[in-house]
């Protein structure tokens, strides 16, 4: 009986350590080739206006900026409403970019991609440009 409790506690501790490591591991925001991007749609949550960016120079600036950003999970985002900018990226084939698509930029150092808020740990988001 004692042996089962020790094994169970060991498994629980290992699982908790794994969750802590997973939660704290840094993530790249994206890794896209700017030449593969056809359009970036930025929806302003403050005004309700959407901006469709198709200019290649603007796309290159935004994608290269976001490619250089590294993030870390900071807290759960469930239950939070409202945002500054929602970013959707469309590729040359007309499909949305995978993984980090439809994310929300709340500030120059905070991104929301449910179910978490993410803090910038490397690089910076050119918030004023977006």
Put a short name on every predicted segment:
Residues 7-22:
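Hydrophobic membrane-insertion alpha-helices, especially the h-region
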Residues 18-78:
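N-terminal export/targeting and maturation segments
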Residues 45-48, 92-96, 115:
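Glycine-centered tight beta-turn/hairpin loop motif at sheet-sheet or coil-to-beta transitions
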Residues 60-64, 105-114, 130:
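Short, surface-exposed linear segments at secondary-structure transitions and domain or protein termini
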């Amino acid at each position: 009986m004692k042996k089962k409790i020790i094994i169970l506690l060991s498994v629980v501790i290992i699982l908790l350590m794994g969750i802590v490591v997973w939660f704290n591991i840094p993530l790249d925001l994206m890794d896209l080739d700017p030449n593969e991007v056809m359009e970036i749609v930025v929806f302003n949550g403050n005004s309700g206006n959407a901006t469709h960016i198709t200019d290649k120079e603007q796309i290159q600036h935004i994608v290269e900026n976001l490619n250089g950003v590294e993030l870390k999970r900071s807290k759960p985002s469930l239950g939070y409403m409202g945002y500054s900018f929602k970013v959707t990226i469309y590729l040359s084939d007309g499909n949305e970019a995978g993984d980090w698509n439809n994310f929300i930029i709340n500030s120059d150092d905070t991104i929301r991609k449910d179910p978490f808020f993410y803090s910038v740990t490397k690089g910076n988001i050119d918030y004023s440009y977006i």
